[in-house]
């Protein structure tokens, strides 16, 4: 009999508590149904009015968005139903606590029978209406706490219920607190994926910019490796800067004729290749200035192919054309030291012997020898441009870089003006008349 009485009480309690929960669930469900109906009405209105003027692809896109919105609404409905079920679970416990003091005999009847069987029968009804399992477990724990008091002490049962209303209150707050995070996934789902990826990339870039000044070895290394390379040529600009205007190519000559200025090269390279010091070079220049009167016959005897006493480019061309480049090198190497120093030209042969150029066999090397002239003219006449004070640079071939194919002509001494150069090249057959 007490079991049946308990069943009736449980059914009465469920009947008493269910209407409020049902009203809440129905109110929320009605709002959700109104949302779905509004979306459907929107789709119907779109189908009726604006979809007439849209293409098939645009209609598909609109339908896709409507379906996604409906799916998001359905996903949002599930936690709402769970909240309603929890409220239904909490309300019966409250009503039990309120009804227990008014009916102490019913509480005594509930304690006497086997608690396992009675609770197992009463709880499924609550769980069917509730849904979530953790809330059902909490309800079982609350029921397990109430039965232990013995039969006779009714006042203890009266004192026991007051803590019960305080215990279900925290679950309500704990269940309502996570409700804002329930809307958070909805916001993440509604945000397009490209925007999320762009935000992540921007955050990473901002983090890298923040880390680059503090940790230059991570992000700033490529920049640091580039800056010294960029600053290197800047610091070295003053050195090679003046060398660019010192090597002008005459635009009026053909491309196969290259005219270089020997005095515009760096003195360190030339002196190191010639293996002579500045003092020795000055002594050679002085000897050349004082003793060039009888130097040309000695040079002719040595086999350099220049007729003595003449300084015209025509004679120089004929005398230079008799022996080949190799023969002139051999003759310069076999020439004695005395007349060579007096003439000043064997210094160029020494330079060629120490650093033979790779383009000597391919082309011709012409050196126009000056006649008797003043020292200032001998030392200064060449292409206009920055010159070294040392006049010995005029007697040497200063460039040992290989030229593809061409003729290197070095002018020095008297008659090195533009007309003399053109006349000499014309007689050699190296100048093409443009007119």
Swiss-Prot record:
Region (Disordered): 1-22, 92-276, 295-420
Transmembrane segments: none
Record-linked Pfam families: SARG (PF15385)
Residues the record lists as Phosphothreonine modifications: 45, 146, 167
Omega-N-methylarginine modified-residue sites: 252, 320, 378, 414
Skewed-composition ranges (Pro residues): 146-169
Positions of post-translational Asymmetric dimethylarginine modification: 252
Modification Phosphoserine, positions: 8, 43, 166, 179, 212, 215, 312, 400
Keywords attached to this entry: Methylation, Phosphoprotein
Sequence ranges of Polar residues compositional bias: 11-20
Keyword Phosphoprotein: yes
Protein name: Proline and serine-rich protein 2
Domain of life: Eukaryota
Compositionally biased tracts (Low complexity): 92-102, 113-126, 228-237
Biased amino acid composition, Gly residues: 302-311
Native species: Homo sapiens (Human)
Biased composition (Basic and acidic residues): 1-10
Record keyword Cell membrane present: no
Modified positions (Dimethylated arginine) in chain numbering: 320
């Amino acid at each position: 009999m007490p079991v049946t009485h308990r069943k009736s009480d449980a059914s009465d309690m469920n009947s008493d508590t269910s209407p409020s929960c049902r009203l809440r669930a129905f109110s929320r469900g009605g709002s959700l149904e109104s949302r779905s109906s509004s979306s459907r009405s929107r789709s119907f209105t779109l189908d009726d009015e604006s979809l007439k003027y849209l293409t098939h692809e645009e209609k598909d896109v609109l339908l896709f968005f409507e379906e996604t919105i409906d799916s998001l609404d359905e996903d949002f409905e599930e936690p709402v139903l769970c909240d309603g079920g929890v409220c239904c679970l909490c309300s019966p416990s409250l009503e039990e606590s309120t009804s227990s003091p008014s009916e102490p005999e019913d509480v005594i009847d509930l304690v006497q029978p086997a608690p396992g069987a009675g609770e197992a029968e009463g709880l499924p009804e609550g769980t069917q209406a509730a849904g979530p399992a953790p809330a059902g477990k909490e309800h079982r724990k609350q029921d397990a706490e109430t039965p232990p008091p013995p039969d006779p002490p009714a006042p203890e049962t009266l004192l026991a219920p007051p803590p019960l209303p305080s215990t279900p209150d925290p679950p309500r707050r704990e269940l309502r607190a996570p409700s804002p995070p329930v809307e958070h996934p909805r916001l993440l789902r509604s945000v397009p994926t490209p925007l999320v990826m762009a935000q992540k990339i921007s955050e990473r870039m901002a983090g890298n910019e923040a880390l680059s000044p503090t940790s230059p070895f991570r992000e700033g290394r490529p920049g640091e490796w580039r800056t010294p390379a960029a600053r290197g040529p800047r610091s070295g600009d003053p050195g090679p800067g003046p060398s660019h205007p010192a090597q002008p190519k005459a635009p009026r000559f053909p491309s196969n004729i290259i005219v270089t200025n020997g005095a515009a090269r760096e003195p360190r390279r030339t002196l190191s290749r010639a293996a002579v010091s500045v003092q020795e070079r000055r002594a050679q220049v002085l000897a050349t200035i004082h003793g060039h009167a009888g130097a040309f016959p000695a040079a002719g005897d040595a086999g350099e192919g220049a007729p003595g006493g003449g300084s015209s480019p025509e004679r120089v061309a004929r005398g230079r054309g008799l022996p080949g480049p190799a023969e002139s090198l051999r003759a310069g190497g076999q020439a004695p030291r005395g007349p060579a120093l007096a003439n000043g030209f064997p210094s160029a042969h020494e330079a060629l012997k120490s650093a033979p150029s790779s383009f000597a066999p391919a082309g011709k090397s012409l050196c126009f020898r000056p006649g008797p002239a003043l020292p200032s003219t001998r030392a200064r006449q060449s292409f206009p441009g920055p010159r070294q004070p040392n006049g010995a640079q005029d007697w040497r071939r200063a460039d040992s870089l290989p030229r593809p194919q061409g003729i290197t002509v070095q002018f020095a001494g008297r008659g090195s003006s533009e007309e003399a150069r053109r006349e000499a090249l014309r007689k050699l057959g190296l100048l093409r008349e443009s007119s």
